[in-house]
Amino acid sequence: MNAEDIAQYLKVHPNFFSEHAHVLTEVYLPHPHGGRTISIGECQVLALRDKVKLLEAKLAELIQFGEDNDAVSEKVHRLGLALILARDLEGVLQSTYFNLREDFAVPHIALRLWGDFNGYSDKIEFSPVTPDLRTYAESLAHPACGPHALYDTSTWFGQDAPRLRSFATVALRGEHTFGLLALASEEAERFYPEMGTLYLKRLGELISTALLQYSSNA
């Protein structure tokens, strides 16, 4: 009889230890965290303690996740209020830059717009972009994050561009796509391909809605 036969026997006879309780007190197992031996009962207690620790760690992680989400939601709310209070396109842009830097700690922000924005075309945000970039922005269903700037967006960050290691791009759109928001950081882990982008998408929607007030054809 081998170990597998014994295991199978115990499965077939679940009442074995009820009928032979003394066996439990006579069988000793190696301690999982040391060299001594312990009884099966002690082993079960240790196993339960380990499970409890894992559950506690998971609960703490979920609580932290919820608190982090609440904090981000509050920041999004503050940006929304600032955009509502903005009195012109310049105010929308300044509120966007300020809140992203101060609340979201995004160190590098650039934005490009195209279309008719009622006399604001002299601003840097209306610098010409390539047709390929427009096509890319139109195809961007969700924010894109990763270690490389897409198309020529790295040039938007001027002399800071060479030291930037992660990027996020968010399409700005209403009925049609009319712009692109680019975020960047020196930290490689700040914007990475597998990260969740729900809040980035919400930010894009808020900023787009605020900007649309000043566009006649977006």
Kindly label every feature range from the protein language model:
Residues 4-50:
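Acidic, low-complexity intrinsically disordered segments
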Residues 36-82:
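Signal-transmission linkers at sensory-effector interfaces
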Residues 85-125:
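Helix-loop-beta substructure at the N-terminus of cytosolic sensory domains
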Residues 125-165:
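Regulatory sensory and allosteric helical modules in signal-transduction proteins
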Residues 165-173:
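Short hydrophobic beta-strand micro-motif common in sensory/regulatory domains
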Residues 172-181:
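Short hydrophobic/glycine-rich mini-motifs in sensory/regulatory modules
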Residues 185-201, 211-218:
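Regulatory loop-to-helix N-cap segments in sensory/regulatory domains
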